[in-house]
Regions:
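Short, well-ordered strand-loop elements centered on a beta-strand within folded domains, enriched
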Residues: 119-126, 161-169
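Sec-dependent N-terminal signal peptides
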Residues: 2-21
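Short helix/turn-capping signatures at newly exposed starts of structured segments
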Residues: 3, 20-143
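Short, exposed beta-strand-loop hairpins at the edges of beta-sheets
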Residues: 148-168
Protein backbone atom coordinates (compact mmCIF):
# COMPACT_ATOMS: atom_id res chain seq x y z
CA UNK A 1 0.00 0.00 0.00
CA UNK A 2 2.89 2.27 0.72
CA UNK A 3 4.20 1.81 -2.82
CA UNK A 4 0.78 2.69 -4.36
CA UNK A 5 0.70 5.91 -2.34
CA UNK A 6 4.21 6.85 -3.48
CA UNK A 7 3.28 6.25 -7.15
CA UNK A 8 0.08 8.32 -6.77
CA UNK A 9 1.97 11.22 -5.16
CA UNK A 10 4.74 11.09 -7.80
CA UNK A 11 2.18 11.04 -10.63
CA UNK A 12 0.27 13.97 -9.14
CA UNK A 13 3.45 16.02 -8.72
CA UNK A 14 4.66 15.22 -12.24
CA UNK A 15 1.31 16.07 -13.78
CA UNK A 16 1.03 19.29 -11.76
CA UNK A 17 4.52 20.38 -12.79
CA UNK A 18 3.79 19.63 -16.45
CA UNK A 19 0.50 21.58 -16.41
CA UNK A 20 2.09 24.50 -14.54
CA UNK A 21 4.97 24.72 -17.02
CA UNK A 22 2.55 24.66 -19.96
CA UNK A 23 0.34 27.37 -18.43
CA UNK A 24 3.39 29.48 -17.59
CA UNK A 25 4.75 29.24 -21.15
CA UNK A 26 1.34 30.18 -22.48
CA UNK A 27 1.18 33.27 -20.27
CA UNK A 28 4.68 34.35 -21.29
CA UNK A 29 3.73 34.02 -24.96
CA UNK A 30 0.59 36.14 -24.44
CA UNK A 31 2.55 38.87 -22.65
CA UNK A 32 5.15 39.01 -25.42
CA UNK A 33 2.40 39.30 -28.02
CA UNK A 34 0.68 42.13 -26.17
CA UNK A 35 3.94 44.02 -25.78
CA UNK A 36 4.60 44.01 -29.54
CA UNK A 37 1.18 45.36 -30.58
CA UNK A 38 1.35 49.04 -31.52
CA UNK A 39 -1.30 51.50 -30.47
CA UNK A 40 -2.19 54.43 -32.71
CA UNK A 41 -1.33 57.67 -30.91
CA UNK A 42 -4.25 59.97 -30.20
CA UNK A 43 -4.67 63.39 -28.62
CA UNK A 44 -7.87 65.10 -27.55
CA UNK A 45 -7.69 68.73 -26.47
CA UNK A 46 -10.52 70.42 -24.59
CA UNK A 47 -10.66 74.08 -23.64
CA UNK A 48 -8.89 77.26 -24.62
CA UNK A 49 -5.87 76.46 -26.82
CA UNK A 50 -4.15 79.79 -27.49
CA UNK A 51 -3.01 80.91 -24.02
CA UNK A 52 0.39 81.59 -22.45
CA UNK A 53 0.68 78.48 -20.30
CA UNK A 54 -0.53 75.87 -22.82
CA UNK A 55 1.90 72.92 -22.78
CA UNK A 56 0.38 70.98 -25.72
CA UNK A 57 3.03 72.25 -28.15
CA UNK A 58 5.73 70.75 -25.92
CA UNK A 59 4.07 67.32 -25.86
CA UNK A 60 5.45 64.87 -28.44
CA UNK A 61 2.13 62.96 -28.29
CA UNK A 62 0.35 66.04 -29.68
CA UNK A 63 2.52 65.88 -32.82
CA UNK A 64 2.35 62.08 -33.04
CA UNK A 65 -1.46 62.22 -32.99
CA UNK A 66 -1.45 64.86 -35.74
CA UNK A 67 0.93 62.67 -37.76
CA UNK A 68 -1.34 59.65 -37.36
CA UNK A 69 -4.56 61.50 -38.23
CA UNK A 70 -5.89 61.04 -34.73
CA UNK A 71 -6.26 64.52 -33.20
CA UNK A 72 -9.51 65.95 -31.87
CA UNK A 73 -10.23 69.41 -30.53
CA UNK A 74 -13.30 69.50 -28.24
CA UNK A 75 -14.28 66.13 -29.75
CA UNK A 76 -14.18 67.57 -33.29
CA UNK A 77 -12.27 65.84 -36.09
CA UNK A 78 -11.53 67.52 -39.40
CA UNK A 79 -13.22 65.71 -42.28
CA UNK A 80 -15.73 63.95 -40.02
CA UNK A 81 -17.47 66.54 -37.85
CA UNK A 82 -20.23 68.89 -39.02
CA UNK A 83 -21.11 72.51 -38.34
CA UNK A 84 -23.80 71.26 -35.94
CA UNK A 85 -21.06 69.34 -34.07
CA UNK A 86 -18.94 72.52 -33.91
CA UNK A 87 -21.82 74.53 -32.41
CA UNK A 88 -22.61 71.75 -29.95
CA UNK A 89 -18.95 71.49 -28.84
CA UNK A 90 -17.92 75.15 -28.63
CA UNK A 91 -21.29 76.94 -28.47
CA UNK A 92 -23.61 78.67 -30.91
CA UNK A 93 -21.81 81.99 -30.57
CA UNK A 94 -19.16 81.24 -33.21
CA UNK A 95 -18.37 84.37 -35.25
CA UNK A 96 -18.30 84.35 -39.02
CA UNK A 97 -14.71 85.17 -39.98
CA UNK A 98 -14.67 85.12 -43.81
CA UNK A 99 -15.61 83.08 -46.89
CA UNK A 100 -13.30 81.68 -49.54
CA UNK A 101 -13.66 79.06 -52.31
CA UNK A 102 -16.92 77.60 -51.01
CA UNK A 103 -15.72 77.39 -47.41
CA UNK A 104 -17.08 79.63 -44.66
CA UNK A 105 -14.72 80.23 -41.76
CA UNK A 106 -15.92 80.78 -38.21
CA UNK A 107 -13.87 81.74 -35.16
CA UNK A 108 -14.21 81.05 -31.46
CA UNK A 109 -11.48 81.43 -28.81
CA UNK A 110 -8.66 81.70 -31.38
CA UNK A 111 -9.67 78.53 -33.22
CA UNK A 112 -10.92 78.93 -36.79
CA UNK A 113 -13.33 76.34 -38.17
CA UNK A 114 -13.76 75.99 -41.94
CA UNK A 115 -17.17 74.63 -42.98
CA UNK A 116 -17.87 73.59 -46.58
CA UNK A 117 -21.17 74.05 -48.45
CA UNK A 118 -22.35 70.64 -47.22
CA UNK A 119 -21.88 71.65 -43.57
CA UNK A 120 -18.76 69.54 -43.01
CA UNK A 121 -15.74 70.65 -40.96
CA UNK A 122 -12.97 70.71 -43.59
CA UNK A 123 -10.44 73.01 -41.94
CA UNK A 124 -9.34 73.80 -38.41
CA UNK A 125 -6.76 76.45 -37.60
CA UNK A 126 -5.31 76.52 -34.10
CA UNK A 127 -3.83 79.95 -33.46
CA UNK A 128 -0.73 79.69 -31.28
CA UNK A 129 0.83 83.17 -31.19
CA UNK A 130 -0.10 83.72 -27.50
CA UNK A 131 1.50 80.47 -26.29
CA UNK A 132 4.87 80.89 -24.53
CA UNK A 133 7.74 79.71 -26.73
CA UNK A 134 5.34 78.46 -29.43
CA UNK A 135 7.90 79.14 -32.17
CA UNK A 136 10.60 77.10 -30.43
CA UNK A 137 8.21 74.32 -29.40
CA UNK A 138 7.01 73.78 -32.97
CA UNK A 139 10.59 73.89 -34.33
CA UNK A 140 11.67 71.32 -31.73
CA UNK A 141 9.11 68.81 -33.06
CA UNK A 142 8.62 69.67 -36.74
CA UNK A 143 11.11 70.47 -39.49
CA UNK A 144 10.81 73.90 -41.13
CA UNK A 145 8.16 73.71 -43.86
CA UNK A 146 7.18 70.13 -43.00
CA UNK A 147 3.58 69.15 -43.74
CA UNK A 148 2.08 65.97 -42.31
CA UNK A 149 0.31 64.09 -45.10
CA UNK A 150 -2.02 61.72 -43.25
CA UNK A 151 -4.76 59.41 -44.44
CA UNK A 152 -7.50 62.07 -44.43
CA UNK A 153 -5.77 65.39 -43.65
CA UNK A 154 -2.81 67.66 -44.33
CA UNK A 155 -1.31 69.40 -41.30
CA UNK A 156 0.80 72.54 -41.81
CA UNK A 157 2.78 74.31 -39.11
CA UNK A 158 3.43 78.05 -39.12
CA UNK A 159 5.86 78.60 -36.24
CA UNK A 160 4.73 81.26 -33.80
CA UNK A 161 1.44 81.72 -35.66
CA UNK A 162 -0.81 78.71 -36.28
CA UNK A 163 -1.33 75.03 -37.00
CA UNK A 164 -3.68 74.30 -39.90
CA UNK A 165 -5.43 70.94 -40.24
CA UNK A 166 -7.12 70.60 -43.62
CA UNK A 167 -9.23 67.71 -44.90
CA UNK A 168 -8.05 66.08 -48.11
CA UNK A 169 -10.45 66.52 -50.98
CA UNK A 170 -12.47 63.40 -51.68
CA UNK A 171 -12.12 62.16 -55.24
Amino acid sequence: MNQVTKIAVATTLSLGTLLGATAGASAIHADAHAATEQQTPYYTYNGLFNFKGNKALEDKNFYRALQHDNFKYEGLKVGQSTFADVKKSVGNDVKKYYEEKGVTYYEKNDVIFGIDSEGKLVNMTLLIEKINHSDKSVRDHVKQGEIYDTKTTHVAFYSGNSIVIKAKESR
